[in-house]
């Protein structure tokens, strides 16, 4: 009981210290327009080419088969996608049941 009380008091003290407002920082009035990047730099970063991601179909069956949970991981993967379950076929690809 005493350990619980000490832990609770410690958590409350840390919470109060972190929530206590600090002194406001004085900010000098500067020319903020000079700090803005030019419009072309902004547009170049806005229209970047999206990254192409690799989708590996055999990850659940191949990688987890060493631990003996390949079929269970495949079934959980399929249930997560809204199917009734799944299994690893002979090519180590997860096949979902409908």
From Swiss-Prot:
Keywords: Antibiotic, Antimicrobial, Cleavage on pair of basic residues, Defensin, Disulfide bond, Fungicide, Immunity, Innate immunity, Secreted, Signal
Signal peptide: 1-19
Pfam family, one: Defensin_2
Family matches, as SUPFAM superfamilies: Scorpion toxin-like
Cleaved propeptide residues: 20-58
InterPro entries: Defensin_invertebrate/fungal, Scorpion_toxin-like_sf
Family: Belongs to the invertebrate defensin family. Type 1 subfamily.
Role this protein plays: Has antiparasitic activity against promastigote forms of L.major, and antibacterial activity against Gram-positive bacterium S.aureus. Has antifungal activity against the yeasts C.albicans and S.cerevisiae, but not C.glabrata. Has antifungal activity against filamentous fungi A.fumigatus, F.culmorum, F.oxysporum, N.crassa, T.viride and T.mentagrophytes, but not B.bassiana.
Gene3D superfamilies: Knottin, scorpion toxin-like (3.30.30.10)
S-S pairs: 61-88, 74-94, 78-96
Compartment(s) of residence: Secreted
GO CC entries: extracellular region; extracellular space
CDD domains: DEFL_defensin-like
Protein's UniProt name: Defensin
């Amino acid at each position: 009981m005493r350990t619980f009380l000490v832990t609770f008091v410690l958590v409350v003290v840390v919470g109060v210290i972190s929530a206590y407002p600090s002194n406001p920082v004085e900010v000098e009035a500067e020319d903020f327009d000079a700090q803005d990047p030019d419009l072309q730099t902004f547009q170049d970063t806005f229209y970047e080419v999206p990254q192409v991601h690799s989708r590996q179909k055999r990850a659940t069956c191949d990688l987890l088969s060493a631990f003996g949970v390949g079929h269970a991981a495949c079934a959980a993967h399929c249930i997560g996608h809204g199917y009734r379950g799944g299994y690893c076929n002979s090519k180590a690809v997860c096949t979902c049941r409908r």
